[in-house]
């Protein structure tokens, strides 16, 4: 069974194919959790006669993506993908890079390719294969702690096939809105410090008043739910 994409990824994939055909470069900037990797996997599936070089920040990330692919499309086999981490690429020799011979290069979390050493490895690969089509996937194009560098501009010449903000993904129902839960835990040490300060108060009237406040605070804290209760109440789906 072929890889099936959700509508937001289908439209992004169509834009990717058109942009790759026109410019050879395409970036997709979608929030985490929207299934960006499936856009890359669909490109691999539709290009089985081509060699895909897939670069990822870590083995764990790529392994998790493959597990998600297997869950949704168990019959899909992508033997045309050569996978490397950015760190592995950084240390590859020219001969090893020459053995890759990619028709397509996928840069997952492409903003990471702006790092000094990882970026050098990516540039070495791109220089070796200037005609390979380049697809980038990331939740952001900006390296905020690196002079606000825009990696979509640097790597893809500004060719962004699809861009979606976190707010848009929530409004469109692609992602669930966040749920914030405020609670107090591990307060015993702080409470003991307040008790000690109250006991050392010389003025009896002030001390008596403070002790009343402390007792009221203690009763309130005793009624507070523990972390186990909070997790069970608000984290109903832990699969």
For every predicted segment, state its role.
Residues 1-27:
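Conserved pre-motif I regulatory segment
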Residues 16, 39-47, 121:
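Hydrophobic residues on the short alpha-helix immediately C-terminal to a glycine-rich phosphate/catalytic loop
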Residues 22-43:
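Walker A/P-loop
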Residues 58, 85-88, 137-141:
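A short beta-strand-to-loop transition that corresponds to the Sensor-1 phosphate-sensing loop
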Residues 62-101:
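Inter-Walker segment of RecA-like/P-loop motor cores
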Residues 97-143:
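SF2 helicase catalytic motif II
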Residues 146-238:
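Interdomain helical connector at the RecA1-RecA2 junction of SF1/SF2 helicase-like NTPases
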